[in-house]
């Protein structure tokens, strides 16, 4: 991580915080139905229906109903997954604003349309398979925090795509002028000081997590990654070592860090996002509202978020992670394969072995 001279100031005094207990979130298979419909060469409509007998609100962020260029579907051609070129975002599941949710009465539906060519190169044309499955956090009734999550699996679409038409669809991620490793235009003043502190905190998290992964308590590793195999432990350790190196490098690195929303994709409740295809990491306004340092528990602080985002960056360690789940209670329900590829499992593990 290259840091311009304006960033070499001492970090602001860190605010210490204590984490609160995380609510238990139940997971179920019924309640929401998701259907995909092709409506154009590369355009898709998603319909979500509340099949429960009560009102339900679901999180829109990082789902088919997110207006940001997140991964809404998986695209494959001839058995191979088409690379995703959009953004991977981070939010604190226990502190989302009302607008992060969509409320549905019993039997009601909501629709969203999107163009899959905005975040994937489909210029090869031909037959593509489009699928979507995962888990959506929900609120049953009139609450303000998720009460559970619902697994879903939509129908699979087979779309015959005109490659020339697809190539004319504008990317959802605009090109930027070349920037320094830590962007000097957006990382100034207090932003620069706080980010410098977050990067130092990231080094501590990543170094201790690397040590714990390679030679620490096997039960603790099992808690977060659902395996104790040496191959998995060494792979996790290597990812953390690569992150520690990226966070500690003052003059060189593989990512570009923006302290403000240069792509204009932030929404209330979003903390940061990464564009792996560009090796760009962007902090949202809510990042700066987090405590710079949390000393106990598993709540996010600045360094926690940096670790989360850097696990997404394929330029730091490949393959990059995705976002199957957020928060301890959701992340611990993932299987081993999902846990090893989920960004928040890494941040949670790093926070646990460092703070507790």
Curated annotation (Swiss-Prot):
Details of cofactor binding: Binds 1 zinc ion per subunit.
Disulfide bonds: 187-259, 266-284
A GO biological process held by the record: proteolysis
Subcellular location: Secreted
Key words of the record: Cleavage on pair of basic residues, Disulfide bond, Hydrolase, Metal-binding, Metalloprotease, Protease, Secreted, Signal, Virulence, Zinc, Zymogen
Broad class of the protein's primary localization: secreted
Signal peptide segment: 1-19
Amino-acid positions noted as binding Zn(2+) in the UniProt annotation, renumbered to this chain: 308, 312, 323
Enzyme category, top tier: hydrolase
Molecular-function GO terms, alphabetical: metal ion binding; metalloendopeptidase activity
EC number annotated for this UniProt entry: 3.4.24.39
Family matches, as SUPFAM superfamilies: Metalloproteases ('zincins'), catalytic domain
UniProt-annotated catalytic positions: 309
Pfam family, one: Peptidase_M35
Organism domain of life: Eukaryota
One GO CC term, this protein: extracellular region
The protein's role, per its UniProt record: Secreted metalloproteinase that allows assimilation of proteinaceous substrates. Shows high activities on basic nuclear substrates such as histone and protamine. May be involved in virulence.
Family: Belongs to the peptidase M35 family.
Protein name as it appears in the record: Neutral protease 2 homolog MEP5
């Amino acid at each position: 991580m290259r840091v311009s001279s304006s960033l070499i100031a001492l970090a602001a005094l860190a605010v210490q915080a204590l984490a609160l207990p995380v609510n238990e979130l139940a997971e179920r298979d019924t309640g929401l139905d998701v259907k995909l419909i092709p409506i154009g060469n590369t355009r898709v409509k998603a319909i979500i229906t509340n099949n429960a007998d009560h009102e339900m609100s679901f999180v829109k962020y990082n789902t088919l109903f997110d207006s940001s260029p997140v991964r809404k579907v998986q695209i494959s051609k001839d058995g191979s997954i088409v690379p995703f070129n959009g953004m991977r975002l981070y939010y604190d599941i226990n502190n989302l604003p009302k607008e992060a949710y969509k409320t549905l009465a019993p039997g009601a539906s909501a629709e969203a349309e999107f163009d899959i060519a905005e975040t994937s190169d489909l210029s090869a044309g031909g037959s593509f398979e489009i699928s979507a499955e995962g888990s959506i956090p929900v609120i049953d009734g009139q609450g303000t925090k998720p009460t559970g999550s619902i697994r879903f699996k939509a129908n699979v679409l087979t779309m015959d795509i005109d490659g020339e038409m697809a190539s004319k669809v504008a990317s959802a991620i605009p090109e930027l002028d070349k920037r320094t490793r830590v962007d000097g235009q957006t990382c100034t003043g207090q932003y620069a000081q706080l980010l410098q502190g977050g990067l130092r905190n990231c080094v501590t998290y990543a170094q201790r997590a690397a040590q714990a992964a390679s030679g620490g308590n096997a039960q603790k590793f099992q808690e977060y990654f659902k395996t104790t195999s040496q191959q998995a432990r060494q792979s996790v350790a290597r990812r953390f070592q690569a992150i520690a190196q990226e966070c500690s490098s003052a003059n060189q690195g593989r990512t570009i860090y923006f302290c403000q929303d240069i792509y204009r994709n932030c929404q209330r409740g979003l903390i940061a996002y990464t564009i792996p295809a560009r090796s760009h990491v962007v902090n949202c306004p809510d990042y700066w509202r987090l405590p710079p340092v949390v000393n106990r528990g598993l709540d996010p602080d600045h360094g926690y978020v940096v670790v989360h985002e850097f696990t997404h960056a394929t330029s730091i360690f490949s393959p990059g992670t995705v976002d199957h789940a957020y928060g301890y209670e959701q992340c611990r329900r993932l299987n081993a394969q999902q846990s090893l590829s989920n960004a928040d499992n890494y941040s949670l593990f790093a926070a646990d072995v460092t703070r507790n």
